[in-house]
């Protein structure tokens, strides 16, 4: 197999980084590996409507994850996820920068190849548009999906743009990728259309309700469908995550978001991503740390199924 470099874009997909997520060994042959979960960095931010810079999110998340690597039995879990799951980091997706169509093709192909070889995908963005080609690959493999979506925005806007990080969840139901009536959006605190039957749990409501009540509503909505889990870091209040392109005050605390995530252990989560970390706007790497922690907690959700 031939590997790409940033200087010489080829048809093959991955470029190395200096280190992997959680100090995991880098593996540039993910399709042939025995991994359960494959982490891919997705340095794409050409679909943003506000501040750019999320293309540097994967690097920042990996760097922050080094601070999490030492804790073998992560609190409050009772196990080391690295002993339950075979997790690899395959580096960053390579595509022709400036060419969104090429990005979409490469993202779908990479995820589809991983899924067809028995792996699951955890993707580190990048802006939130990366979720659309990932949903296409997952729906092709698993069928129609339920979506669990943490965000300040519903991303259901119909503005006619083919590449926009605010339109994916308008497009995905139209393409039959997700069932909006079995999907839930958590942390919303911006104006949005109510034409689609998503269950919307606004940030004020989530902050007022108990964690247990929020988890109950999520589980009640998605049922036993295969679930795609996506976490836009701007779901968190800017006091916890300032380093993002479109921050909105009044969001969730990192504590509440993590507790909600930990309640989702018995759902059939088949794909996951963390998006919209833009380190140039960060303070003391707290947004990158939040992104790394959320990504790690997502993996612990999967490890908990091995009990």
From Swiss-Prot:
<feature type="binding site">
    <location>
        <position position="232"/>
    </location>
    <ligand>
        <name>Mn(2+)</name>
    </ligand>
</feature>
<dbReference type="Pfam" id="PF00491">
    <property type="entry name" value="Arginase"/>
</dbReference>
<keyword id="KW-0620">Polyamine biosynthesis</keyword>
<comment type="function">
    <text>Catalyzes the formation of putrescine from agmatine.</text>
</comment>
<feature type="binding site">
    <location>
        <position position="128"/>
    </location>
    <ligand>
        <name>Mn(2+)</name>
    </ligand>
</feature>
<dbReference type="GO" id="GO:0008783">
    <property type="term" value="F:agmatinase activity"/>
</dbReference>
<dbReference type="InterPro" id="IPR023696">
    <property type="entry name" value="Ureohydrolase_dom_sf"/>
</dbReference>
<dbReference type="GO" id="GO:0033389">
    <property type="term" value="P:putrescine biosynthetic process from arginine, via agmatine"/>
</dbReference>
<dbReference type="GO" id="GO:0030145">
    <property type="term" value="F:manganese ion binding"/>
</dbReference>
<keyword id="KW-0661">Putrescine biosynthesis</keyword>
<dbReference type="InterPro" id="IPR006035">
    <property type="entry name" value="Ureohydrolase"/>
</dbReference>
<keyword id="KW-0745">Spermidine biosynthesis</keyword>
<feature type="binding site">
    <location>
        <position position="153"/>
    </location>
    <ligand>
        <name>Mn(2+)</name>
    </ligand>
</feature>
<dbReference type="InterPro" id="IPR020855">
    <property type="entry name" value="Ureohydrolase_Mn_BS"/>
</dbReference>
<feature type="binding site">
    <location>
        <position position="234"/>
    </location>
    <ligand>
        <name>Mn(2+)</name>
    </ligand>
</feature>
<dbReference type="InterPro" id="IPR005925">
    <property type="entry name" value="Agmatinase-rel"/>
</dbReference>
<dbReference type="InterPro" id="IPR023694">
    <property type="entry name" value="Agmatinase"/>
</dbReference>
<keyword id="KW-0464">Manganese</keyword>
<dbReference type="GO" id="GO:0008295">
    <property type="term" value="P:spermidine biosynthetic process"/>
</dbReference>
<protein>
    <recommendedName>
        <fullName>Agmatinase</fullName>
        <ecNumber>3.5.3.11</ecNumber>
    </recommendedName>
</protein>
<keyword id="KW-0378">Hydrolase</keyword>
<feature type="binding site">
    <location>
        <position position="155"/>
    </location>
    <ligand>
        <name>Mn(2+)</name>
    </ligand>
</feature>
<feature type="binding site">
    <location>
        <position position="151"/>
    </location>
    <ligand>
        <name>Mn(2+)</name>
    </ligand>
</feature>
<comment type="similarity">
    <text>Belongs to the arginase family. Agmatinase subfamily.</text>
</comment>
<comment type="pathway">
    <text>Amine and polyamine biosynthesis; putrescine biosynthesis via agmatine pathway; putrescine from agmatine: step 1/1.</text>
</comment>
<keyword id="KW-0479">Metal-binding</keyword>
